[in-house]
Amino acid sequence: YTCIDETAPVINILHAQSITLVTYIDWTDDMGEYCEFRDRVKNKDTFALLDKCINRVKCADITEEPVSLGHDNIELKLGGGYSGEFANEELLDLQKNEHDIIPQLLERLYYNGLYGMQACAGTTAPRLSGLWVGEWNLLWRSAYTMDANVNIQVSGINSSGLYEAGAGYMWFILRQIPDWVNNAAMVYGMKDAVLIPVNTDGHRAMMVEYDINYPFQYWNAGAGWMLIPIYEFLQTYGDAVITTDDVALIKMYGKDTFDVRKDVYEPLLKKTYNFWKQIGNPEYYTDTDGNARYEKGKCSLNESEHYLIIPSFSPENKPFGYHSAITANAAMDISAAKDVINMYTEMLNYTKVDGYEQAVSEAEALLRMLPDFMYDESGAVKEWSMKEYGENNAHRHISHLYPAWPALQTQHDSKLASACRQAIINRNHENKGKDDTASHGWIHKALVEARLKNADAVYDTLNLLVHSDIFYTTLFTDHNTDRSKGVYC
């Protein structure tokens, strides 16, 4: 029975200094028909409210209010293909017999993506289940997963002019920051720094997932990734003010109005920078020849030495033949650290706060002490900048391509750009027929290829997806290209 049911059993406890209540809660869908279930509990007033709600819905004059995109400046017209109007399932069936992408289908997928983001916009980010699957008891607890899924889902909010989606994303972040600060303190003993978990329910974000194969407590790059859409929001709209009526947020921060730059971006960037400032330890370093070293009591690095970023985790992979995913010098970490430091120095040069010249000098010194990217015999960027690790390309994630997307480090570095392109080629070849059914992996590759200005590869990836079984008739997508997971992604 519910805890608010006055007829339910009550336990009275007297003269206790403290009480510990251990409960176990589970879901069930084995409740039978509603009428049978109601008869078993008909003496409980709890169901009066349910009956009232059902009767109100039956009597209500319900009108459908379509979600309005309201983006007159956003349009995609490809031309060609079939003439006439087709239902979604008709287009999907037609696509099965066409070698090339049907333009009408691609247009509709684009607008459907805009619709999905607009429908989710305003108060939070989209979660794994979205609004689109029809049930909530899904895989991965229908969570907000922040090592690829949320990131890919919000990747187009700024370039598409979805202002409300950007604001909702920031509310999503602001709810979590206190827990992020606590995570950094509990895992690493850091002060005024942030460390994010892989999953959140959208309200709390404590670090609760620890595993030798998925050691997300050592996923260092997450906060930098989550920061980038806010950075892009400022680039898109300039200085802006957002307002919330969320009581919990107002209570948490003591206000309902936030300056995006001063109240959201700059404080989070400073905490993210503080993380990278504190993780380096001179006792763990690589020498002039790139060999990993440990020297107890070492207090500073020599000119040709670099920090080891240790521990490190490259979601969700581990080196070939290595027993653990807890590693060092993940390329994702190196890239995220460089990106955050560059954003931080850019912020300092913009705000020119007292002592900013010294702070810029310290940040640039830290940048020089970070490890460099390493390259394998094929010329691909290595997922771990360590001589001791072998590449493991039979994997769905491409976290090591962070320099291309979401960062912009390949834009003016042709060697790094070529290395990222080769890394995708290696992944596609060595992971074929293994765990290459994860749709987020293919979309991630398409985003990287777009940044690398490789139009043919972007087209090939999209063509693979439209010929897979990824799409529901709503045109929303499954986690897997064979629709084996039943969860919107």
Kindly label every feature range from the protein language model.
Residues 1-144, 163-167, 173-183, 388:
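Acidic/polar, glycine-enriched structural segments that form the non-catalytic walls/loops
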Residues 126-158, 171, 268, 272, ...:
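Zinc-dependent metallopeptidase catalytic helix centered on the HExxH motif
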Residues 128-143, 191-264, 277-362, 403:
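The feature captures the catalytic groove of carbohydrate-active enzymes
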Residues 146-149, 158-186, 190-193, 203-205, ...:
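Active-site core of glycosidic bond-cleaving carbohydrate-active enzymes
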Residues 115-125, 138-146, 165, 178-183, ...:
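Secretory-pathway/luminal and periplasmic proteins that interact with or process carbohydrate-rich
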Residues 36-39, 93-100, 139-140, 155-156, ...:
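Second-shell loop/turn segments in exported
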Residues 106-120, 223-232, 267-276:
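Extended, hydrophobic/aromatic-rich amphipathic alpha-helical segments that build helical scaffolds
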Residues 25-27, 121, 132, 136, ...:
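Short, flexible loop/turn elements at secondary-structure junctions
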